[in-house]
């Protein structure tokens, strides 16, 4: 019986993780749950899964719900130190990191040091601090990817040697604006950007998918997870979202992992690895889908993808800067403060404000803070 903590249980990945856990009551139990601010759903989840430790990042939500949780015998906490304590609870085997942003950074690092398994659904952690996390991780042992693309690559590489890999092909649906012209992209609305053609996800990642920044972040994550140089990682647009990624080998063979666009599949694969168990999820019917198509990404219409690849290749603090600036720019777009194409423009401006420095965790956290502040200033009209 694996004892799990879920950081981000009320979000899309967290809710689907709990669905998977419910399929296998004899294999998993939930020890603690953490959420940003949805106290109502968090309490429902705690009661349903008999959880006694809970966390709310938002202080106001914490104050609102503290007594209600206490009435049910559940200890509710808040603050970054308490989130870390949650991840390090005695007897915990693994942690699903599914809160977007860098809030999972310290819990991930300390949990790895403490010998726990990380089920990585938070790509920002690896993007911002890949250089620090890589020496601590053993892929397939103490860290398992949950992202569908990285799960696909991980599955395709089973039993293979990295020396045989010619190229990783990371697929992207192309988002809701795949066929839009640059002129059309100037005036897209938040509502339009949130209509992803294939996946049901949280707001932040849905906007990242619309700008293709998400694919850029995934390329950086793949670089660190699989220790593959950027020159060997290539994005490809695949509108049907059936092939989740491919690995091309030097002998000309290409291995692809296929499945319906349903995050419960890669979540289950990570949690039950190295075994596979039957479930009640719908399966893939290729004759119903009929056609699988592929296109090259357009870097002019989707500059965020190019920025991410450039930041990845530059290394050092640049992926962390990219990630932090993007988070603030996406927040601003969702709030109606900037236009869609301005997301990448803000990120580029912030990237241009930084120079390489000596890398450590403290530096990454400082850079993350500074990049966010600069992004807010650019959005507010300062430093034009």
Curated annotation (Swiss-Prot):
Source superkingdom: Bacteria
Pfam families, A to Z: DXP_redisom_C, DXP_reductoisom, DXPR_C
Binding residues for Mn(2+): 147, 149, 218
A molecular-function term among this protein's GO annotations: manganese ion binding
Coiled coil: none
Record-listed NADPH binding positions: 10-13, 36-38, 122, 124, 202
Cofactor(s) this protein cannot do without: Mg(2+); Mn(2+)
Signal peptide, first to last residue: none
Keywords: Isoprene biosynthesis, Manganese, Metal-binding, NADP, Oxidoreductase
Pathway annotation: Isoprenoid biosynthesis; isopentenyl diphosphate biosynthesis via DXP pathway; isopentenyl diphosphate from 1-deoxy-D-xylulose 5-phosphate: step 1/6
Amino-acid positions noted as binding 1-deoxy-D-xylulose 5-phosphate in the UniProt annotation, renumbered to this chain: 123, 148-149, 173, 196, 209, 214-215, 218
Function according to Swiss-Prot or TrEMBL: Catalyzes the NADPH-dependent rearrangement and reduction of 1-deoxy-D-xylulose-5-phosphate (DXP) to 2-C-methyl-D-erythritol 4-phosphate (MEP).
Family recorded in the similarity comment: Belongs to the DXR family.
PANTHER family from the UniProt entry: 1-DEOXY-D-XYLULOSE 5-PHOSPHATE REDUCTOISOMERASE, 1-DEOXY-D-XYLULOSE 5-PHOSPHATE REDUCTOISOMERASE, CHLOROPLASTIC
NCBIfam families: Dxr (TIGR00243), PRK12464.1 (NF009114)
Protein name as annotated: 1-deoxy-D-xylulose 5-phosphate reductoisomerase
Organism: Carboxydothermus hydrogenoformans (strain ATCC BAA-161 / DSM 6008 / Z-2901)
UniProt lineage: Bacteria, Bacillati, Bacillota, Clostridia, Thermoanaerobacterales
Gene name linked to the record: dxr
């Amino acid at each position: 019986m694996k004892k799990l903590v879920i950081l981000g249980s009320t979000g899309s990945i967290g809710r689907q993780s709990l669905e998977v856990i419910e399929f296998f009551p004899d294999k998993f139990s939930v020890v603690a749950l953490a959420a940003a601010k949805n106290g109502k759903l968090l309490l429902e989840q705690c009661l349903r899964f008999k959880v006694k430790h809970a966390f709310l990042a938002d202080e106001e939500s914490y104050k609102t719900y503290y007594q209600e949780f206490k009435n049910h015998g559940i200890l509710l906490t808040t603050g970054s130190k308490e989130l870390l304590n949650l991840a390090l609870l005695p007897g915990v085997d693994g942690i699903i990191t599914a809160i977007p942003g860098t809030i999972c950074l310290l819990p991930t690092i300390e949990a790895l040091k403490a010998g726990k398994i990380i089920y990585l659904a938070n790509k920002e952690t690896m993007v911002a601090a890949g250089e620090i996390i890589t020496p601590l991780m053993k892929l397939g042992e103490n860290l398992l990817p949950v992202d569908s693309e990285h799960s696909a690559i991980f599955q395709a590489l089973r039993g293979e040697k990295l020396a045989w890999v010619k190229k990783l092909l990371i697929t992207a649906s192309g988002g809701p604006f795949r066929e839009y012209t640059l002129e059309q992209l100037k005036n897209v609305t938040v509502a339009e950007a949130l209509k992803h053609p294939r996946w049901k996800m949280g707001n932040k990642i849905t906007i990242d998918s619309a700008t293709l920044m998400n694919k850029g972040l995934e390329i950086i994550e793949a670089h660190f997870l699989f220790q593959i140089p950027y020159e060997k990682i290539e994005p490809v647009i695949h509108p049907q979202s059936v092939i989740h990624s491919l690995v091309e080998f030097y002998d000309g063979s290409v291995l692809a992992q296929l499945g319906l666009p349903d995050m419960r599949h890669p979540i289950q694969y990570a949690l039950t690895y190295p075994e596979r168990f039957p479930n009640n999820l719908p399966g893939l019917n290729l004759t119903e889908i009929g056609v699988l198509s592929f296109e090259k990404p357009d870097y002019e219409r989707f500059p965020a993808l190019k920025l991410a690849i450039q930041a990845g290749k530059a290394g050092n603090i640049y992926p962390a800067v990219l990630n932090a600036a993007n988070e603030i720019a996406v927040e601003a777009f969702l709030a109606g403060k900037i236009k869609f194409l301005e997301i990448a423009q803000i990120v580029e401006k912030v990237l241009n404000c930084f120079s390489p420095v000596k890398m450590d965790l403290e530096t990454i956290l400082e850079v993350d803070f500074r990049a966010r502040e600069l992004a807010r200033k650019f959005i507010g009209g300062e430093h034009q």
